[in-house]
Design a protein with these regions (language model features):
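Active-site neighborhood of glycoside hydrolase catalytic domains
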Residues: 151-229
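Aromatic-lined ligand-binding clefts that engage carbohydrates, nucleic acids, or primary amines
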Residues: 422-436, 465, 532-555, 562-563, ...
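An active-site-proximal structural segment forming one wall of the substrate-binding cleft
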Residues: 100-117, 140-177
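Aromatic- and acidic-residue-enriched segments that line the glycan-binding/catalytic groove
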Residues: 91-99, 110, 120-146, 160, ...
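Aromatic-lined substrate-binding rim segments of carbohydrate-active enzymes
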Residues: 62-128, 200-205
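Catalytic-core region of carbohydrate-active enzymes that cleave or remodel glycosidic bonds
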Residues: 206, 210, 239-337, 341, ...
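The substrate-binding groove and active-site-proximal loops of carbohydrate-active enzymes
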Residues: 47-58, 83-100, 137-156, 181-192, ...
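N-terminal carbohydrate-binding accessory modules
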Residues: 23-76, 106
Length: 611
């Protein structure tokens, strides 16, 4: 009986992979759980999915990535929905351009793929603040990931608006969305089942009733994070031999009857600033994938394609005490690299999927070549001090969120009322500071390595103290995210005495291209402008090794962060973001100087030598 079921199951999977028409329904279909497995239109269905995130991929490349997914043998793709991208200010929604998640899902369907949707509202994902909009932190009494009405009200409003975009695309309405995840790994955070029920209720009220709801946790966290009447996915990695068997054995102690779904199969890992570039054991990962597929279990690769956390969107990790900001690249050592090119891992997984499903996948699409750009100089500059906005005066320090700011930098300025010599202490530095006295740099402090104080010699009353603070990325994991405000969130003391009376300058750096640049030397924190010409539009990798720490924009598009501690030394430049003819690069660098150069490489440098 079991053998006959598996034979029929394998046939259904093979047909689903081989026939795009099955993933392009023109009429309503059903997707449910029956007899311990997923069923599509009352037939067993094995999900073989891969995760990729629409804001981490240039819109012009979405369809190419989907075709690569089909060619590897996948029958579905998985994506989070990133609340902070869609509601940057309360009630102001953005589903345009790269935020058009509905179009992303429609294109997936057109390319023969089902969709597993993960709307959060919390998503983790090594993404800024786990996908939460920073404005939630303005109310210091609001409790994230809880039944606090101050949190539930904006979350429910957000889900209702998202439902207008995506509920029509559920499989029961003729769309490709087969699964919708309730929250995300909540069992690693808490065990408030009333909150999980409320989150499920918000999704139902938003119209997510024509697909199958589920929860996802680590196997041991399922009791804390799951809902008893919903199927569960479990999240784990395959670097260790036999990992999949062990994880599902653990799950079966709690949920012996299935369905069995590895909702995040970690096939790589992410990088922190100051650490190594991650790489994982592809052979063991392929073996664990092979074992799961042979059992008839469903799986979603995390990640199939990582892409890039463009601009300010990298997250950070913490164990509750430390701080580990993520780099801009989300290459993840995944089957498709950061720029969408298949790796050795892609070929290995493709072979496993074809063998286990008995289906011949489509041919792997040809990949356009990358290009080099000759070295060019950043010859124009303007000092940050010359483009400061109007100040907000406050007796006490205020955070970015207190001032309605989400990302970027913030400057705290004051006049010291007496000569003194002692320790300057920044209590609650989030995250990186450069300290100036009368315009001269006296030191840097880095939350990443738990730096909080430096020696300060104030020669006379009236000296100007400037503290320039960078938001290096909000923590996206751990309960500490509830207090993850940026700037200085405590007090500044000198020789044990609190300093008050501040001029505060919010520096979101939304449009640095509007500054007035000139050919001149620049000291301290500076914006640099450079231009280069191309006649061919192709991907390249901008080598920023000549700069120290800051941010880069290309033709007005935010590319990401620069930090000379590595491991990342290049920033991915998508070909569609280039112009034929002149292109503009702006670099904000905390360390001024002259002779700064840039170069476009045909391969990335994500850790050590070019990949």
């Amino acid at each position: 009986m079991v053998t006959r079921w598996l034979q029929g199951f394998a046939f259904a999977v093979a047909v689903a992979i081989a026939s795009p028409a099955l993933a392009q329904p023109i009429a309503p279909h059903s997707f449910t759980v029956k007899n311990g497995h997923f069923e599509l239109d009352d037939k067993p269905f094995q999900i073989i999915s891969g995760e990729l995130h629409y804001p981490r991929i240039p819109r012009a490349y979405w369809r190419e990535r989907f075709r690569m997914a089909r060619a590897m043998g996948l029958n579905a793709v998985t994506t989070y929905v990133f609340w902070n991208m869609h509601e940057p200010r309360p009630g102001a929604y953005d589903f345009s351009g790269n935020n058009d998640v509905a179009e992303f899902i429609r294109e997936a369907q057109q390319e023969g793929l089902y969709v597993v949707l993960r709307p959060g509202p919390y998503v983790c994902a090594e993404w800024e603040f786990g996908g939460y909009p920073a404005w939630l932190l303005k109310d210091h009494s609001l409790v994230l990931r809880s039944n606090d009405p101050k949190f539930i009200e904006p979350a429910a409003r957000w889900f209702k608006r998202l439902g207008q975009e995506l509920a029509p695309l559920q499989v029961g309405n003729g769309g490709p969305i087969i699964l919708v995840q309730v929250e995300n790994e909540y069992g690693s955070f808490g065990n408030d089942h009333a909150y999980m029920e409320k989150t499920r209720g918000m999704l139902v009220e938003a119209g997510f009733t024509k697909s199958q709801l589920y929860t996802a946790d680590g196997a041991e966290q399922v009791p804390a994070g799951a809902l008893p009447d919903l199927p569960v996915g479990i999240n784990f990695g395959g670097t260790d031999a036999g990992a999949a068997r062990r994880e599902f054995e653990e799950l079966k102690k709690i949920r012996p009857n299935g369905p069995f779904f590895n909702s995040e199969y970690w096939d790589g890992w992410f990088d922190h600033w100051g650490g190594p570039h991650a790489s994982t054991n592809a052979v063991n990962e392929a073996d664990n994938l092979d074992w799961m597929l042979k059992q008839g279990y469903s799986v979603s690769l995390y990640m199939f394609h990582g892409g890039t956390s463009f601009g300010w969107m990298n997250g950070a990790n913490s164990n509750g005490k430390n701080y580990e900001p993520d780099v801009t690249s989300y290459d993840y050592d995944s089957p498709l690299d950061e720029s969408g090119r298949p790796t050795a891992k892609y070929s290995l997984f493709r072979e496993v999927i074809a063998k286990d499903t008995g289906a011949t996948p489509p041919a792997v699409p040809a990949v356009a070549p990358t290009m080099k750009i000759p070295e060019f100089k950043a010859e124009q500059a303007v000092a940050l001090w010359k483009v400061l906005p109007a100040a907000v005066h406050s007796q006490q320090l205020q955070s970015m969120e207190d001032l309605g700011q989400a990302y970027g930098y913030i400057l705290y300025r004051t006049r010291l009322n007496a000569a003194s010599k002692g320790h300057l202490v920044l209590d609650g530095l989030h995250d990186y500071a450069r300290v100036y006295l009368d315009g001269k740099l006296v030191g840097t402090l880095d939350r990443r390595i738990d730096q909080k104080q430096l020696s300060l010699d104030v020669p006379a009353a009236g000296a100007q103290l400037d503290i320039l603070v960078e938001n290096t990325g909000r923590i996206n994991f751990n309960i500490i995210l509830r207090q993850e405000r940026k700037g200085i969130v405590g007090q500044v003391t000198l020789d044990g005495k609190a300093i008050s009376g501040w001029d505060i300058y919010p520096l979101p750096m939304d449009q640095p291209e509007e500054y007035s640049f000139a050919r001149s030397s620049c000291e301290g924190a500076c914006f640099y402008r450079a231009t280069f010409h191309v006649e061919t539009l192709a991907d390249t990798f901008l080598d920023t090794s000549a700069f120290s720490k800051g941010q880069v924009w290309l033709n007005g598009q935010p590319l990401g962060r620069v930090w000379n501690i590595g491991p990342q030394k290049t920033l991915y430049v998508p070909g569609p973001w280039l112009h034929k003819g002149e292109n503009e690069v702006i670099v904000f660098d905390l360390q001024g100087g002259t002779g700064r150069t840039l170069v476009g490489r045909d391969k990335p440098i994500l850790g050590g030598k070019a990949e």
